[in-house]
Amino acid sequence: MTLLPTCETRVLLTSHMKRFFILISTAWLLSPIFLFAGNHPGTDRISLNNNCPPGFEQVAGKCYLRNLYQLYPSLQDAGVGGLKTGLPALREGFTPRQIDLGRYLFFDPFLSGDGSLSCGSCHHPDFGFSDGMDRSIGITGDKVKRSSPSLWNVAFLDDLFWDARAASLEEQSKGPLFSPDEMGNTEDRLVSDLNGNQTYIRLFNEAFGSQAITAPLVYTALAAFQSTLISLNSRYDQYAHGYHAALTQTEIEGFNIFRSFVARCAECHTPPLFTNREIAIIGTPEPAGLPFDEGEGGWTGEPTQRGGFKVPALRNIALTAPYMHSGRFDNLKDAVGFYTKGRGHAVPESENLSIHWHIWEPDLSDHEVDLIVSFLETLSDESLEPAIPERVPSGLNPVGRMPARNTN
């Protein structure tokens, strides 16, 4: 049974929706369409945006998210899988210039040790801010240990990385930047290189009022940009806000299975973010020839956390194949089908994992798995996707080397 909103709620939602779409339209109209590079030979001057990204409102010079979910109660009040669910707190309150500076840094290969990779190489908009690989390819040309997680809605997450080892977006930035097998840079070299670029010196001064570029300012700018990667306007969201024609009957059936006590998907992938932001041990298999990945237990040393990984958000999940921390499953049907095969069925005999209590054997039919997949495809929404800069301050090609999409 679907509960319709009261007249008072309808009026409030209508008013808020008008304001929401005005915010989006105004931000796009005021945003510069072409942003060119600065002091590098052959480029024009780059300027930072003075307006918040679409979906954000500027208050006292800082950007704050405005979304219909903010009108709803907490996740706990709405129940698991409920439609009228609220949002947890998020990182926000950055200035438009800090956000835009972060965008240039994110897509500039200048941040890597040899100028070949940017953050956007492994977190590309075309792949749902992942990279389409089972495991990402780093600066050495070799695959790294895990797949590249999507960055959509990371502003809502308390812990980052598959194994939850970073407690903030700023801390998370250091991992790929300075990992020898990812972007291969060092903090000293990064700061030195940026301070040797007159365009970056000017942009950091405009964004932070600082005459010198420091590492913490780099991390803050990257965090500011990533905090605006919001995806909450899919067809599912339209359905959740009361427009029931947004989903087909097949997709609604898939959603009902998804949140049912039998499948229990929504126990961990809780709307509206479709993650409970916790660690789960589910015992997914590693690719052939690879050792067992200890996950969270690898850095905590806690035996009960071995094989534990962050519950990924399912927003834009149709764009981010392959799936799981190692990219073990090529498609959504295989990923969903994994859960139907029995508790701990893929755990190596040498491991005694504390499998999450939600994991059991729902014994779903192929048709029911297909219905869940059809629902998951309704979570696609790139309406607030930021533009890749036409030019970046280094003069290098934006984004950098992109590996071919494959799982070999």
Please place each PLM-identified region on the residue numbering:
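Bacterial N-terminal signal peptides
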Residues: 24-32
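Short glycine/threonine-rich turn/loop motifs
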Residues: 39-175, 237-351, 387-408
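Boundary at the C-terminal end of the N-terminal hydrophobic targeting segment
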Residues: 35-37
